[in-house]
């Protein structure tokens, strides 16, 4: 009921505030006009009344707003007090047990939780127990297993050549003296001397360039062999001629009237056969070359 009353009063105050503002504006406009003295006096009185009513309305409005603020702060305080009463735990740390939770206020019924962390070597089991008292109830929770695993201690490094104190998974051949079964089972201990590492340089493979060839069928016409007819060369048998010349001269006249030359060429072949005789004139005889062996006495 109180909330509804506050809302009604707030609405009425807003309405009166608006109406009074309008009245002040109207009265100021009328006062500026040149009216009679009685009207001006009445307008001034109305303006005074309106201004005082505005002041009163403002005071009432501020007071109602303060009441609302106080109500909200009271509600917030009640809520915080309830939260404080219901919050059960405060966080502290214990170096031996780990992390533990406990509550300082023991007036109301509360729940307290204690978390005990054991050492990592011992496995813990989840245990939850509830203890009821007159005012408090406590619960204890322990984790099941630790999350971290124990690391195994590595044995110290031993010298490479001292094999007397090492435990082998096989039988070394140094123990076997003359036992054949021992020699069949044993293994030789490798020498752990650091050897030089052979660094192999990568060899570059030769790059083979391949050129694409157009394999097209070659259409070549076969060349025609020139047909040559065998020409029969004439066999010329040249025989050295035996020239016999007779010159007829006319001694009486002294002028060469008639010259006749009879040339008889007797050609003999390699077989001893004679060729037919030839008779030349003097002009033909002089034009042919003569050899000294073939010229006979005229």
From Swiss-Prot:
Sites where a glycan is attached: 70, 72, 80, 86-87, 92, 100, 103, 105, 119, 135, 137-139, 144, 147, 199, 203, 219, 231, 235, 237, 250, 253, 269-270, 275, 282-283, 287, 294
Annotated region (Disordered), positions in chain: 132-161, 192-298
Pfam families: Glycoprotein_G
GO biological process assignments: symbiont entry into host cell; virion attachment to host cell
UniProt topological domain (Extracellular) ranges: 67-298
Family: Belongs to the pneumoviruses glycoprotein G family.
Listed name of the protein: Major surface glycoprotein G
Native source organism of the sequence: Human respiratory syncytial virus A (strain rsb6190)
């Amino acid at each position: 009921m109180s909330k509804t009353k506050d809302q009604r009063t707030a609405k009425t105050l807003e309405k009166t505030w608006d109406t009074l503002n309008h009245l002040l504006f109207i009265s100021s406009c009328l006062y500026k006009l040149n009216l009679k003295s009685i009207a001006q006096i009445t307008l001034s009185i109305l303006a005074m009344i309106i201004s005082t009513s505005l002041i009163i309305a403002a005071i009432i409005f501020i007071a109602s707003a303060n009441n609302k603020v106080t109500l909200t702060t009271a509600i917030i305080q009640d809520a915080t007090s309830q939260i404080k009463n219901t919050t059960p735990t405060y966080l502290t740390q214990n170096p031996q047990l780990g992390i533990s939770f406990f509550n300082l206020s023991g007036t109301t019924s509360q729940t307290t939780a204690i978390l005990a962390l054991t050492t990592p070597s011992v496995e813990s089991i989840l245990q939850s127990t509830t203890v009821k008292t007159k005012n408090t109830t406590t619960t204890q929770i322990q984790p099941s297993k630790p999350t971290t695993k124990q690391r195994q201690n590595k044995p110290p490094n031993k010298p490479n050549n001292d094999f007397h104190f090492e435990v082998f998974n096989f039988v070394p051949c140094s123990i076997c003296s003359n036992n054949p079964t021992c020699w069949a089972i044993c293994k030789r201990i490798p020498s752990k001397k650091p050897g030089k590492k052979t660094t192999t340089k990568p060899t570059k493979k030769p790059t083979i360039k391949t050129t694409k060839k157009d394999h097209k069928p070659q259409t070549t016409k076969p060349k025609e062999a020139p047909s040559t007819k065998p020409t029969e060369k004439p066999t010329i048998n040249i025989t050295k001629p035996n020239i016999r010349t007779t010159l007829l001269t006319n001694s009486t006249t002294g002028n060469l009237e008639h010259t006749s030359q009879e040339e008889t060429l007797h050609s003999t072949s390699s077989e001893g056969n004679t060729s037919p005789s030839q008779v030349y004139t003097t002009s033909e005889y002089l034009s042919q070359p003569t050899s000294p062996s073939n010229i006979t006495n005229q």
